[in-house]
Amino acid sequence: MIVEQFVMAYGAEQDRLRALLPEGFASLRPVLRINAEVRDGKTGALEFNTAAEKADNRGWVNIGRWDDVPFTKGGKKTTFTLPELTISFTGVGIEGGCPAEKDNVGCYYLKDGTFTLVPAEKITANKEFCDCEFAWRFAGGAHGVSLGKTLPAIPEEETTHYEKAAFTVENAAVIPCMQVLGAYQVTFER
């Protein structure tokens, strides 16, 4: 299958992320990530996750996952639309990489009440940086536009203790976007 993968990360208050994480997970960085895919030019898919560590495994924990996501293409722009979210990626013709790749053993997914680690996919194809804009459609949902550069997500010490909150898409999506940190697209065979 040919996969066009689009990835965007945005900064979010790390203390709020800590309050959401399930038992046994620790927040690595103040970041939320949206991964979107077009599979064989026909089917869209989307995931929402945050950087986390569990049992010495550093990577991501999945907050939400959608299949059969509607998408449109126009020129270099690809837009994914859900009732909860709209996100667009526009290739800018500059190749680069992702700083989080070096610190990623995989992603934890919740199934039947248990989190399972799925190893990171090895992708050797070149990545193209993208401009990106997104908006969660929940009341008070995060939204943002990229600045045309990649910014680091630097871990923050705890400064505010929030009450534990349910690990849900809506609770994560209403944490304000401090800044879109970067976005890229890559095409590969899976």
Feature roles, as predicted:
Residues 4, 15, 40, 56, ...:
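Acidic-enriched, low-complexity/disordered segments with a strong bias for Aspartate over Glutamate
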Residues 40-76:
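A glycine-rich, hydrophobic loop/mini-helix early in the fold
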